[in-house]
Amino acid sequence: MSKFVVVVFPNETRAYEGSRALKDLHVDGSLFLYGMAVIAKDAAGNVKVKESVDPGPLGTAVGVLLGGLVGVIGGPAGVVAGAAGGTVLGSLFDIVNLGVGEDYVTKVSEELGPGKTAIIAEVDENWTTPLDTRMGALNGTVLRTWRSDFEDDQIAKEVAAEEADFEALKAEYAQATAEAKANLKAKLDQAKADLKQADARLQARIDELNNEMDVRLAAQEKQMATAQAEAKEKIKKRMAAIRADYTARTAKLKQAWQLTKEALAA
């Protein structure tokens, strides 16, 4: 499972030195850098994007986190300061979908004071020392959080609830009087339609995860091709961890998908 990293620096110059150091760590195989962006907070407390994340599948999550953080802590009226506007709440929802907790957002907001600049990145790392050492030498403060499978858990829970509703309605319909069945038929048909949509949503998410895993593994393979022997061993371990993580995530969804298939076939 990868991590989101926010590194806060006292000024923009240090941040760009930090971004070069982060790229160097990727080149030497100490970590894998999926995507990176740079933001700065001005004297008025407004956050501006100084360097946006590279487009493409590897940078997608960082792009979402970047947009979410800017939306939440991008000005004096952010969520951390107590506001609850629709745009801000939407940004917070995007962050939560990545598995990033509100406590982490608060830490970033508190650390990123006026005049400071931060790197936002998604990385895979075997050890924390290489990144901490390089960033610490530039007076950077490293804040880490795991990227979790919150979205997958939520999908599985929603599908389980829809399946339970469908099974309950089927049981009620089977024992209902003729008059009651007429009223229940529309509900049962709607529940079945909802379950079919859930089935399609599960399959689409499973395909999405499989594609994402393939892209990440291919990128790691590319990094390993130019790495030194010691770094290659680290990369192999990261690749094994990626496979294990995605296998576990898809297994939960496949289990839910199988249950929907059985419910619809019954």
Where are the model-predicted features located?
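Membrane-engaging insertion elements
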Residues: A84-D124
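A generic local secondary-structure boundary/capping motif
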Residues: L25-D28, K107-E110, D132
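Short, low-complexity, glycine-enriched hydrophobic/amphipathic alpha-helices that associate
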Residues: V53-G99
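Short, extreme N-terminal segment that most often corresponds to the first beta-strand
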Residues: S2-N11
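Amphipathic, membrane-inserting segments
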Residues: E110-L169
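Heptad-repeat coiled-coil alpha-helices
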Residues: F166, K170-A266
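Envelope-exposed proteins and targeting segments
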Residues: K3, Y34, G115-T117
